[in-house]
From Swiss-Prot:
Residues of the propeptide: 25-111
Family named by the database record: Belongs to the peptidase S8 family.
Organism the protein comes from: Arabidopsis thaliana (Mouse-ear cress)
Predominant localisation class: secreted
Any one of the GO CC terms: extracellular region
Domain Peptidase S8: 115-589
Catalytic activity, EC: 3.4.21.-
Signal peptide per UniProt: 1-24
PA domain residues: 362-442
Protein name: Subtilisin-like protease SBT4.6
Amino acid sequence: MATAVSYCLLSCIFALLVVSFASAGKDDQDKQVYIVYMGALPSRVDYMPMSHHTSILQDVTGESSIQDRLVRNYKRSFNGFAARLTESEREILASMDEVVSVFPSKNLNLQTTTSWNFMGLKEGKRTKRNPLIESDTIIGVIDSGIYPESDSFSGKGFGPPPKKWKGVCKGGTNFTCNNKLIGARYYTPKLEGFPESARDNTGHGSHTASIAAGNAVKHVSFYGLGNGTVRGGVPAARIAVYKVCDPGVIRCTSDGILAAFDDAIADKVDIITVSLGADAVGTFEEDTLAIGAFHAMAKGILTVNGAGNNGPERRTIVSMAPWLFTVAASNMNRAFITKVVLGNGKTIVGRSVNSFDLNGKKYPLVYGKSASSRCDASSAGFCSPGCLDSKRVKGKIVLCDTQRNPGEAQAMGAVASIVRNPYEDAASVFSFPVSVLSEDDYNIVLSYVNSTKNPKAAVLKSETIFNQKAPVVASYSSRGPNPLIHDILKPDITAPGSEILAAYSPYVPPSESDTRHVKYTVISGTSMSCPHVAGVAAYIKTFHPLWSPSMIQSAIMTTAWPMNASTSPSNELAEFAYGAGHVDPIAAIHPGLVYEANKSDHITFLCGFNYTGKKLRLISGDSSSCTKEQTKSLTRNLNYPSMSAQVSGTKPFKVTFRRTVTNVGRPNATYKAKVVGSKLKVKVVPAVLSLKSLYEKKSFTVTVSGAGPKAENLVSAQLIWSDGVHFVRSPIVVYA
């Protein structure tokens, strides 16, 4: 009897345990990482953010131990934490007066031997520099880490870090900083096979860091292609890296990115470059980059961000806040071309970075559709995985309707591949000989194959040319208009982003299915244009160390090379593709006038964007409030270097922009307004500005009127203020 009772009791306990474990398992599955953003740090001396965060989390979860809940604290530059929460816990936290927002931690995506010469920033003594101030400049790189042994980041010849530096070298396992690479932190989770370290396991972070501030390294090439000196915009500057991207997956969590901003600001970096972007965007208080960059701006730090790689369609821009300096990508005059010689003697010019030399030998040509017996025609034409028959492609050159799958041809024994890309405006590295052709050129090859009994071709090693039309906005570069703030023009500026040769990590091959390992390679993207502008911003700061982030941004935008619709593959998008134009580093040193917007101006902007009361005070960290006038203020009146307005396309419109300029040129200057390139009626009042002293400010209005533009189109003009020496240019954009 006792045995039966004991058995029954054990059975009941076991059943309860099963239910308990099942419930716990379900509860864990229901939890996800949320960011609890609480605004600026309170100014009270006795405020202890970590204790406060712990107390809040204990109260909401009902758990005394929150070790498994708390992911990280934000405690150095702004206030908040990341934690594993259920939906009901998220709702409770979101309702608290001391909380600005609670939003899921998402994954963000990762977005040179001649590019700096192309922009006018020449090597050596040909470019004016302030080496001592440049050496005191620190660029914070929020990315995938860095390869510290690269010559681009050597500390040889550098003195100790600047006295203002408050950071550390916490690079982790087998990682050493130096007097060039002065700081390193990492925020990535521990993954099997990857040591906990700030080392770069994707190559992306090393590439972007060297573009911005890498040392000058001579005789660099990619297997002989692009040979020259690789260097950053400010080679004497220091670098601090903040690794936020998971090794092996090339994804970057927003809770880690926010922690990187928290540290970078407190570490006293001068410029932040962040070549990351979200797939989808929300409001400002749920936008990780916007939050981090706002607090950086409040501390005098400019954040530069890539526009995104989702072009050429409109409204694909993902960097939208006005305190983020948003950079589109263009080409430069250098290009890598890969010729295809057909059996009939015709030569077709394609694009790729092909370092493989087949010695001009011609091989049989086969189309993917003809090399498959188990896929439909479309999939076979694309050389989709599992479609190609090795017996039909081995030892041949395979034509594929897309450049996404040449590796399939290689895996099946092909010696080379010819692929199609309607936007073949940026050469890529492949793991075997590939030439990427335009639609028309690809059809020429296809026609030759279909009309010839034994078609043959040769794919030659790439050549470097220097006569390419430039700058032209890259097809992949994301376009406006701004989907969140319709009256703020984005992108802001354009810089080289295509076919950039820069430092890399030898831990990862330069392309998919590649067996090679290199320390320098060629990559394209707004990830590459972003650090170019960060380097320019740092360069300007060496001449004007007291300038605010908005002054530096204005100087770059108003002195940019003018661009026009012919420099964008989607011509009708114009300024939505290139913003104010192409960056000109030398002109940006002396802009004449600047449009300055400080923290209080951005607070007024937030008032007009319906941020009021307690939430506004939490974000600002002070007693800021919105007056009735500020609440009614239009976002287009933020003192921004460009002017943009969305209007009705069905009726005449009239919009007014209010702006203020600050004289940074010369005293006793008179600037006259001129409007060029417009079908619009534009009135500037006053049309003449007399400035007696440096840093004197003058305000004016710009009123634009006309018939409503056609749907999905824009109409633009250029306002130029000139004193005969300086030409301060701002785009004016109106769209429906």
